[in-house]
Amino acid sequence: MELVLGLKYIAVALLIGFGAIGTAVGFGNMGGKFLEACARQPELAPSLQVKMFILAGLIDAVAMIGVGIAMVLLFVL
């Protein structure tokens, strides 16, 4: 039984950790592409900024869903 609990804790840690790493990589790629696009066509910067913030919310939601699933694994199952 202790082995199962230990593996559950490792699974929760990996789920939260990989979710955070994926979110960080996503934000980095998105920010870099946004800056490249604004440097090429500065007149499109306001519309690109709105789209970037919408995508930032969606990318961040992936990490929050991962944390929610991890909490269910930790406290319910």
From Swiss-Prot:
InterPro entries xrefs: ATP_synth_csu_bac/chlpt, ATP_synth_F0_csu, ATP_synth_F0_csu_DDCD_BS, ATP_synth_F0_csu_sf, ATPase_proteolipid_c-like_dom, F/V-ATP_Csub_sf
CDD domains the record matches: ATP-synt_Fo_c_ATPE
Transmembrane parts of this sequence: 10-30, 57-77
Cellular component terms per the entry's GO annotation: plasma membrane; proton-transporting ATP synthase complex; proton-transporting two-sector ATPase complex, proton-transporting domain
Keyword Aminoacyl-tRNA synthetase annotated: no
This protein's record includes keyword Ion transport: yes
Site location (Reversibly protonated during proton transport): 60
Pfam families assigned to the protein according to its UniProt record, in alphabetical order: ATP-synt_C
Subcellular location: Cell inner membrane
Keywords associated with the record: ATP synthesis, Cell inner membrane, Cell membrane, CF(0), Hydrogen ion transport, Ion transport, Lipid-binding, Membrane, Transmembrane, Transmembrane helix, Transport
Gene3D superfamilies named among the record's database cross-references: F1F0 ATP synthase subunit C
Membrane topology value: Multi-pass membrane protein
GO MF assignments: lipid binding; proton-transporting ATP synthase activity, rotational mechanism
Function recorded in the entry: F(1)F(0) ATP synthase produces ATP from ADP in the presence of a proton or sodium gradient. F-type ATPases consist of two structural domains, F(1) containing the extramembraneous catalytic core and F(0) containing the membrane proton channel, linked together by a central stalk and a peripheral stalk. During catalysis, ATP synthesis in the catalytic domain of F(1) is coupled via a rotary mechanism of the central stalk subunits to proton translocation. Key component of the F(0) channel; it plays a direct role in translocation across the membrane. A homomeric c-ring of between 10-14 subunits forms the central stalk rotor element with the F(1) delta and epsilon subunits.
Subunit composition and interactions: F-type ATPases have 2 components, F(1) - the catalytic core - and F(0) - the membrane proton channel. F(1) has five subunits: alpha(3), beta(3), gamma(1), delta(1), epsilon(1). F(0) has three main subunits: a(1), b(2) and c(10-14). The alpha and beta chains form an alternating ring which encloses part of the gamma chain. F(1) is attached to F(0) by a central stalk formed by the gamma and epsilon chains, while a peripheral stalk is formed by the delta and b chains.
Family: Belongs to the ATPase C chain family.
Protein name as annotated: ATP synthase subunit c
Lineage, highest ranks first: Bacteria, Pseudomonadati, Pseudomonadota, Gammaproteobacteria, Alteromonadales
